[in-house]
Regions:
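TRNA-recognition modules of translation machinery and tRNA-sensing kinases, especially anticodon-binding
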Residues: 1-221
Length: 222
């Protein structure tokens, strides 16, 4: 919509709200039909936009009295960082391919970083000794994570999780998700990240962007 309306290239902030449906079988804490809200911040370079979104998340959790919220944050670096780390992770996991399930094998083939998102206990055990993206991140990326954690230390329970990659391949830079232990197998009710390269990949202008999606019913359910 941003590209169609020729809004790419401008400093813009958008929000949306509406019903959506899941194709896959919903797990505990999820519904077939659900309402989702989203926030997109376009044209703002890394730094201030991240602080604004984290502040919004802290306020939402407080306003809706979310039980035991934890905001997990990570940084995926730049394309070169992701490529180097991806190769290192692939080298580590290849000798243990026979221990991975079918879904994680597909992830390993198409995007090794997505294996970090696996919920399989066996895969998680294998990943305990895997390389960490923190070893490949530039100093500025690590400093941003520490800065966010420090600024909001009294408002949010923030955890730096270097295995957090999110489920969409277009994310670059800062990524995050907020979880609650009360929501079953799928405990993330909010998540997002920076996607600076997506607009140009879809035929629009090259511009920085960051956003998040919020599962609205999870904020209002008992």
């Amino acid at each position: 919509s941003v590209i169609e309306k020729k809004l790419d290239g401008d400093l813009s902030k958008f929000y949306y709200l509406g019903p959506m449906w899941r194709y896959e079988r919903p797990q505990k804490g999820r519904f077939r039909q659900f309402f989702q809200a989203g926030v997109e911040v376009l044209g703002y370079p890394e730094g201030l936009a991240e602080l604004e979104l984290v502040s919004m998340i802290c306020n939402l959790n407080k306003e809706f009295k979310i039980n035991n919220p934890v905001l997990k944050i990570n940084h995926l670096g730049n394309p070169e960082t992701k490529e180097k780390f991806s190769r290192s992770l692939l080298d580590y996991l290849n000798p243990m391919k026979s221990d991975l399930n079918e879904k994680d094998l597909s992830r390993l083939k198409n995007n090794p970083l997505r294996v970090l998102d696996s919920k399989d206990p066996k895969t998680q055990e294998i990943l305990k000794d895997a390389p960490s993206i923190s070893d490949y991140l530039p100093k500025s990326s690590l400093e941003l994570l520490l800065k966010i954690k420090k600024i909001f230390s009294e408002e949010c329970n923030i955890k730096i999780d270097h295995n957090l990659v999110r489920g969409l391949d277009y994310y670059s830079g800062f990524v995050f998700e907020s979880i609650s232990s009360d929501l079953g197998a799928q405990d993330a009710y909010l998540g997002g990240g920076r996607y600076d390269n997506l607009c140009s990949q879809l035929g629009g202008k090259d511009m920085p962007a960051i956003g998040m999606a919020i599962g609205c019913l999870l904020y209002t359910s008992d």
